[in-house]
Amino acid sequence: MAKQVPERSKPNAGKPSIRKVWSVNGHRLKRHKLLRDLVLIMIAPVLVYLMASLFTYSKDDPGWSQSGSAIVHNIGGKAGAWIADVLFQLCGFVAFLLPVALGVVSWIALFGSDQEEQAEGHLEPALRLVGIVGFLIAATGLFHLHLFQSDVARAGGILGKQVCNSLQAGFGVFGTNLFVLMLLLISVTLATGLSWFALMERIGRAVLAVPPLLQKSKRRADEWQHARALREEREEVRKIDAVQRAKRDPMKIELPPEPIVEKSERAKRDTQIPMFLGVNKRGSDLPSLALLDNPKPQIKGYSDETLEALSRQIELKFKDFRIDVQVVGAYPGPVITRFEIEPARGVKVSQISALDKDIARGLSVKSVRVVEVIPGKSVIGLEIPNVNREMIFLSELLRSKEYDKSPSSLTLALGKNIAGRPTVADLARMPHLLVAGTTGSGKSVAVNAMVLSLLFKASHNDLRMLMIDPKMLELSVYQGIPHLLAPVVTDMKEAANGLRWCVAEMERRYKLMSVVGVRNLAGFNKKVKDAEEAGQPLMDPLFKPNPDLSEVPRPLQKLPFIVIFIDEFADMMMIVGKKVEELIARLAQKARAAGIHLILATQRPSVDVITGLIKANIPTRIAFQVSSKIDSRTILDQSGAETLLGHGDMLYLPPGTAMPERVHGAFVSDDEVHRVVEYLKASAPVQYVDGVLDEIQTMDDGVVIGPAGFPESASGGGDETDPLYDEALRIVTETRRASISSVQRRLRIGYNRAARLIEAMETAGVVSPPEHNGDRAVLAPPPR
């Protein structure tokens, strides 16, 4: 039988677990608190009874010092009278301190014992009892020495008399005072644990804190006096201002006339929306204005009384900063109200501009914009937001006479100015536009309003668009309208290809205008139209027929405007980079006369996105609300956009000026955009141009547009160093056809370049020389 091995004893065997120790300590603490509450309940009535008996003591009551059958006047009855008599006879006036001392010591003993083992200064109950006895002896002695009377009950009692007589016999009166005072201090320390040195330190700190408190009180008193003087001065200024206001001319309040927007003839004609979009004759007309929502009645801004009171408040706020101004005019608008202020002599404009945030805080408004220079006036503008902001609908602007009478096919309806008048701009005069602002400032809505402005002004025969939408949200809704050159671009590599096609188209148009002898697209279209009406159409001077085919020159056609929309320019810059910046810069520099225009939008107005090269070639800019003055200077070269209100509030910098104009942008809903898009889809089929998004962009003469937008030399292409040589070699060896027209058609290049590629293959031994019928044999084997 195997020997049984005893189990090893655990090292902590026999020791109580932590949970058990906590449980025992918890029960013990609970019992201690219960006992403490019971003792407090018993002691409190005793102390109250003792105090009441002492305060109602009467010498006529029977007690320890006298007997009798008189009526007891003590509230504590016979026992109370007897106890009070004993205490007064023994302790004198100290009897009143006895209940207080017992109460203090009991409180310390009961509620100061939880941390008795950890905290210093807590003594044993026996020492507390010794302290109480010593306190009674010392107190009775002091009372007997300093409050001595013939009646012992009025001094320190019998106990005090005996203590003082015993000590005076040996130490005299001075020594007795010292010993009794020493006994009093020691007894208080034993009974309560009080440290006299700590008490003196607290008293010293309190004494040292008195002078700063006095100084602070004096400073507050001085400030109160100063504020009182300022209030009196302000009241005096108000009285003087009231007298001056009564004498001067009333403030000029120029209210906009009603109605602000006069309807055009087209707006009166387009009053009903077509019931069936599909029955519209294709290519017959522009979209009907009835497709857009009608404006709703809205609450106007400030009343005349409010404007008058607000102007006085503006003057008083400037007086608070020691600047004297006078409000001379108020011009309420749909979103903001401009107050024209005339500063006193010697007041700089910079002083007023530096107070824009303080004035906004004083007037309890979101922001205040200071217009430092108003052309034609010697006043300063102060633009304050209205309490009730009006919403501006796009239909109001498109129905206005300003939009309808604009002769340009590239008219943009931007919004309303501060007076409520429609603001329209000609993209052909800009000729390019940069739009920037933070998220939620109304930038995307403004771009949609610009697109609809162009669609309501020009048909697809007069206007073509290339839309680049990196976010795939804002411009993708226009997919399928006949105005598009290509589907809405969401791939940034295809965006670069589309921009290269625009550069190639720009170069082609310049060559056509040079041959025809005109300076811009309008002159070219007019000359083509006049030639057609005269029955002698102009032939394409750049047409090069294919020798293999019998082709005749094509007559020149009217060239449409091309507008390139880029919704988020910063994303495209991050993905494609420097290549796109060079293409955009090249278009911005030369594309105006060719009828090609750019509208760039970005929500990140930083210097790495809006570079100096782009700003130099796009002088027309629109800034929506931005977060800082730095962003505003990046867009407009000046501050101001950081004080805009958002939701379409913009600063429009027209071409050729340095003073931005404040415009409130129009709102266009998604439903309105969808209705217009469906109408255009039903009116004409989509007419995409082949090759717009191809990677290789080649002009009619075989010249390739390089990555930077510059045409490569024709003489440099067509040999084995040509970037298309490998692709042409693959096509020839796969199809087993060495045809110039086949290579030209497959690669979408010019005839001359395709011929040079075939000749390079002949030199390399890939194809044979041409036979008597012009055919070539493919000598190289097909690719595996």
Swiss-Prot record:
Membrane topology label? Multi-pass membrane protein
The entry lists its GO molecular-function terms as: ATP binding; ATP hydrolysis activity; DNA binding
Q: Which residues cross the membrane?
A: 38-58, 68-88, 92-112, 129-149, 178-198
- InterPro entries reported for this sequence: AAA+_ATPase, FtsK/SpoIIIE/SftA, FtsK_4TM, FtsK_alpha, FtsK_dom, Ftsk_gamma, P-loop_NTPase, WH-like_DNA-bd_sf
UniProt GO cellular component terms: plasma membrane
Query: Domain of life here?
Result: Bacteria
Membrane-side (Cytoplasmic) residue stretches:
199-784
Report if keyword Coiled coil is assigned.
no
Per UniProt, subcellular location reads as: Cell inner membrane
Its keywords, alphabetically, are:
ATP-binding, Cell cycle, Cell division, Cell inner membrane, Cell membrane, Chromosome partition, DNA-binding, Membrane, Nucleotide-binding, Transmembrane, Transmembrane helix
Please name the Pfam families in this protein's record: FtsK_4TM, FtsK_alpha, FtsK_gamma, FtsK_SpoIIIE
Keyword Translocase assigned to the entry: answer is: no
Domain FtsK, first and last residues per copy = 420-633
Positions of ATP binding: G440, S441, G442, K443, S444, V445
Relate the protein's function as given in its record: Essential cell division protein that coordinates cell division and chromosome segregation. The N-terminus is involved in assembly of the cell-division machinery. The C-terminus functions as a DNA motor that moves dsDNA in an ATP-dependent manner towards the dif recombination site, which is located within the replication terminus region. Translocation stops specifically at Xer-dif sites, where FtsK interacts with the Xer recombinase, allowing activation of chromosome unlinking by recombination. FtsK orienting polar sequences (KOPS) guide the direction of DNA translocation.
Subunit structure, as described in the record: Homohexamer. Forms a ring that surrounds DNA.
Q: Which family does it belong to?
A: Belongs to the FtsK/SpoIIIE/SftA family.
Protein known as: DNA translocase FtsK
Q: Which organism is it from?
A: Xylella fastidiosa (strain 9a5c)
